[in-house]
Each structure stands twice: as structure tokens, then as C-alpha cells.
Swiss-Prot record:
One of its GO terms (cellular component) is plasma membrane. GO terms for molecular function: metal ion binding. It comes from Streptococcus cristatus. A lipid is attached at C20 (N-palmitoyl cysteine). Part of an ATP-binding cassette (ABC) transport system involved in metal import. Binds a metal with high affinity and specificity and delivers it to the membrane permease for translocation into the cytoplasm. Part of an ATP-driven transport system for manganese. Does not exhibit adhesion properties. The gene is scbA. It is a lipid-anchor. This is Metal ABC transporter substrate-binding lipoprotein ScbA. It comes from the Bacteria. PROSITE patterns: PROKAR_LIPOPROTEIN. A lipid is attached at C20 (S-diacylglycerol cysteine). Belongs to the bacterial solute-binding protein 9 family. Its main location: membrane.
Length: 310
């Protein structure tokens, strides 16, 4: 059913494109700005920090929605077709699940490493462990700030290649942004070093904090491993509850983009409170705390450190 709906949306969008053939890529129209598409709000924000007002930027997956499985709207199809440059996460995020991004770029006749690029290129990939997804890549690399820096470097490189006239601006913005992220990363490592070992475990609904765990030496536990599998089954909850009863973990966390009911059940069964909602697959709405990649990571780091220090 999803596939049929997706194809209908594609057809409608391309009909609209045919009727508006004057709206093309910046190269074809002579526009001074690149048309750039990012698959989600995190990648879009990093891109914005590098490019500023030098590009026209469209983000596909709306704030607060799950990028693992998404159904592009006609506007997304149109923007993708017109794009000079497309940034996606890769490593099993948009190309896993219902493979919505693969279908989108194929229908837009875009080519990998010419029109669209994975911003995660160069990341030290961590793999999933559960039976249903074992051996597949864990996509949540951005939850390690060092990987966020790699994302920014890849974005700046591709922008400079496509738009050499603004290369100096992109490189200057990259330098300032990397310094900002590096300072936060250093602060986080110092903060987590001071938390007692028996309290040091981040417990979330989705098992998306493996990169975070490795970077900041904080073991992780979860109800389900990735959002493309079953979420919050009785067996999943039971397994986590049994694990937590053997620990001294003081706080639980729930992600802003998932149903919080399974974690509430875990909290009730273990008598461990949910300390805070944290961000994983999306930034917050504009004007709210966590509405950029930097501020969402700063918020996460502060809340997790506070919760584990209880």
C-alpha cells in the first residue's frame, strides 16, 4: 500500500514538473545559488552552518518525524529533481526500511557521487546486533560529535566542488563550526568521566546511542534496536526490565520522536524514573531548545549527564 501511494505521489509531482518546466536546477536557470536538498533536519542544519545564505536549501523529512521510513511529498520530489546537490546520511538510514530515498533519487534520475552524497563517508561504522537486523549498519553516527565534524567536512567539500566561487566562505564557516563542535565534545568527555561507573548507562527506547556510548564511554541499553523493527513488544520490555534490575542505573530517557508508552512501562516495572526526553533523529522545532544540531547535542549531553548523576 505504501509503495502504491509513493508511486502516485511521484506521478503527481512529475506531472507538475512537466507543467512547470521553467523551474530547473540553478545550473540550467543561471541562478547564482545552488539548489541543495538534505534528507533530514540534522543534515540540513549542519549544511546551513557551512553554507549560510549562499544556497537554496530544502529539508525533506519534517522536524520530529522518523527518517528511517518516510513517504516523500510531491514538493520533496520536485525539489529533489531540481537539486544541484543532495545530502543524505547513508549507512542504513534513508536506504534501510522502506528504502524511500533510493526510490526518490532513482525516479529523479540523480546519480550517486555526482548529484547525491552520503555525509557519513569516512565514519567508523558500528553494526547492529539484533537477530532481525544483525550485520546491518547502525545509522546514528551523528550522536558522536566527532562524526558530526566529519559530516560538516564532507558537506563543505561537496559545496566547494559544486560552487568554487564561494569556497572561501564554506571553508571559513567550516573552521568556526568545527571549533564549536570540538569544544562541546571535549566538555562532554570531561563531564562523563566524572560519573560513577555503576550509574553509567544510557537507557533509551531505540538502541540508537551506540556511537554516543563509544565516544563518551557510557554503555547503552534499549527496548528495541532500530525503528525499522517491531517497537515495544512485551518480550522486548521484559528483557530490558530484567537487565535493569541488576543495575544501579538512576534514570531512563525517551527520544522525542518515538512513542513514550513502552518506556513508561519499563519505568513502572523497574521503579526507575524517566529523567528527560532527548533528541535522536531530528532537531527540535524552531525556537525551542535543541533546534539545531549543536544545541540538540548540548541539550542531550547535559540531560544525560544530569540524569546519570542522580
Amino acid at each position: 500500500m505504501k509503495k502504491c501511494r509513493f508511486l502516485v505521489l511521484l506521478l503527481l509531482a512529475f506531472v507538475g514538473l512537466a507543467a512547470c518546466s521553467s523551474q530547473k536546477s540553478s545550473t540550467e536557470t543561471g541562478s547564482s545559488k545552488l539548489n541543495v536538498v538534505a534528507t533530514n533536519s540534522i543534515i540540513a542544519d549542519i549544511t546551513k552552518n557551512i553554507a549560510g545564505d549562499k544556497i537554496n536549501l530544502h529539508s525533506i523529512v519534517p522536524v520530529g518525524q522518523d527518517p528511517h521510513e518516510y513517504e516523500p511529498l510531491p514538493e520533496d520530489v520536485k525539489k529533489t529533481s531540481q537539486a544541484d546537490l543532495i545530502f543524505y546520511n547513508g549507512i542504513n538510514l534513508e536506504t534501510g526500511g522502506n528504502a524511500w530515498f533510493t526510490k526518490l533519487v532513482e525516479n529523479a534520475k540523480k546519480k550517486e557521487n555526482k548529484d547525491y552524497y552520503a555525509v557519513s563517508e569516512g565514519v567508523d561504522v558500528i553494526y547492529l546486533e539484533g537477530q532481525s537486523e544483525k550485520g546491518k549498519e547502525d545509522p546514528h553516527a551523528w550522536l558522536n560529535l566527532e562524526n558530526g565534524i566529519i559530516y560538516a567536512q564532507n558537506i563543505a567539500k561537496r559545496l566547494s566542488e559544486k560552487d568554487p566561487a564561494n569556497k572561501e566562505t564554506y571553508e571559513k564557516n567550516l573552521k568556526a563550526y568545527v571549533e564549536k563542535l570540538s569544544a562541546l565534545d571535549k566538555e562532554a568527555k570531561e563531564k562523563f568521566n566524572n560519573i560513577p561507573g555503576e550509574k553509567k548507562m544510557i537507557v533509551t527506547s531505540e538502541g540508537c546511542f551506540k556511537y554516543f556510548s563509544k565516544a563518551y564511554n557510557v554503555p547503552s541499553a534499549y527496548i528495541w534496536e532500530i525503528n525499522t523493527e517491531e517497537e515495544g513488544t512485551p518480550d522486548q520490555i521484559k528483557t530490558l526490565v530484567e537487565k535493569l534490575r541488576k543495575t544501579k542505573v538512576p534514570s531512563l530517557f525517551v527520544e522525542s520522536s518515538v512513542d513514550d508508552r513502552p518506556m513508561k512501562t519499563v519505568s513502572k516495572d523497574t521503579n526507575i524514573p524517566i529523567y528527560a526526553k532527548i533528541f535522536t533523529d531530528s532537531v527540535a522545532e524552531k525556537g525551542e531548545e535543541g533546534d539545531s544540531y549543536y544545541s540538540m547535542m548540548k541539550y542531550n549531553l547535559e540531560k544525560i549527564a544530569e540524569g546519570l548523576s542522580k
